[in-house]
A protein has these predicted regions:
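Surface-exposed loop/edge segments in extracytoplasmic proteins
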Residues: 67-78, 179-185
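Conserved aromatic beta-strand anchor motif in extracellular beta-sandwich/beta-rich domains
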Residues: 58-66, 175-179
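Bacterial N-terminal signal peptides
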Residues: 3-13
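Contiguous beta-strand segments within globular domains
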Residues: 34-47, 53, 152-157
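Short coil-to-beta strand junction motifs in C2/discoidin
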Residues: 54-60, 168-173
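Extracellular acidic, Ser/Thr/Pro-rich low-complexity tracts
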Residues: 48-53, 162-166
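A beta-strand/beta-hairpin structural motif
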Residues: 78-81, 87-98
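Extracellular/luminal regions of secreted and cell-surface proteins that mediate adhesion/ECM remodeling
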Residues: 21, 26-35, 85-86, 103-107, ...
Length: 236
């Protein structure tokens, strides 16, 4: 479940008169991301022209899509409720909402419903618009074994890469050859960096499986690319 806080719901009308009628739209005004939840937020703006109505109203519903899923409505305080104005002399209604501490990885959008009513409270028109998507990428580290090479004596060297957006903590890298296992410990790997690790020897026939973080000490964006199996070299 996403940890989401509503920070601001600000109606913009009155005070400064609008020069012209705003368009009917739902916009993504801002989308910020970051490794910490406190850095992630989105701002959505809905606007509607008056078109002769006595009362203009709009409702924001936040929708979230998790990896591999579909967009689903998120129940939030102060969302999913109608905001309205009957202020005279303004050509339209603009309303802005901000949501903070967005989950990651995930995608968010606002579905904005519009309603026009006459002086007697009768709804004379309705409409709906969907904002562009605010995408929050996965900020976790992503370890993988990039390549395994062998020296002339059959000693393996593995290149370990962190393809993620944040540094990893301490983890192990192992090489399994038949009934033998060699394990090395790395103090961590910064995002976007790689490191060469010297492992044990192996020789044909047989194969070696090199695994980054075999103990799953690091929570990663993708756990499916941590191991590589290669043929052991023929002795010279």
């Amino acid at each position: 479940m996403a940890l989401i806080l509503v920070l601001l719901a600000l109606a913009l009308w009155g005070g400064v008169a609008l020069a012209q009628a705003p368009e009917l739209s739902a916009k993504l005004a801002a989308c910020e991301t970051g490794a910490d939840a406190k850095d992630r937020f989105a701002v959505f703006t809905g606007s509607m022209p008056r078109e002769g109505a006595a009362v203009m109203a709009m409702r924001f519903d936040l929708h979230e899509r998790l990896p591999g899923g579909r967009f689903k409505r998120v129940a939030l305080a102060n969302w999913g409720v109608w905001q309205s104005t009957a202020k005279k002399g303004v050509p339209g209604f603009i309303f802005t909402k901000r949501v903070e501490e967005l989950a990651a990885p995930a995608a968010f959008r606002a579905v904005v419903s519009f309603r026009w009513s006459d002086v007697e409270g009768n709804v004379v028109r309705t409409a709906k618009r969907t904002s562009p998507i605010c995408r929050q990428p996965d900020w976790r580290p992503d370890l993988r074994v990039g390549r395994v090479v062998f020296d002339e004596d059959g000693r393996a060297r593995a290149i370990v890469v962190n393809d993620g957006r944040s540094p990893s903590g301490t983890f192990e890298i192992s090489m399994d050859v038949r009934d033998r296992s060699v394990v090395r410990t790395l103090p961590g790997l910064p995002a976007g960096q790689r490191r060469t690790v010297e492992l044990g020897r192996c020789s044909a026939p047989g194969s070696a499986t090199v695994t980054a973080d075999p103990a799953h000490a690091v929570e990663e964006a993708d756990e499916g690319d941590n191991a590589v199996t290669v043929a052991c070299p023929v002795k010279r």
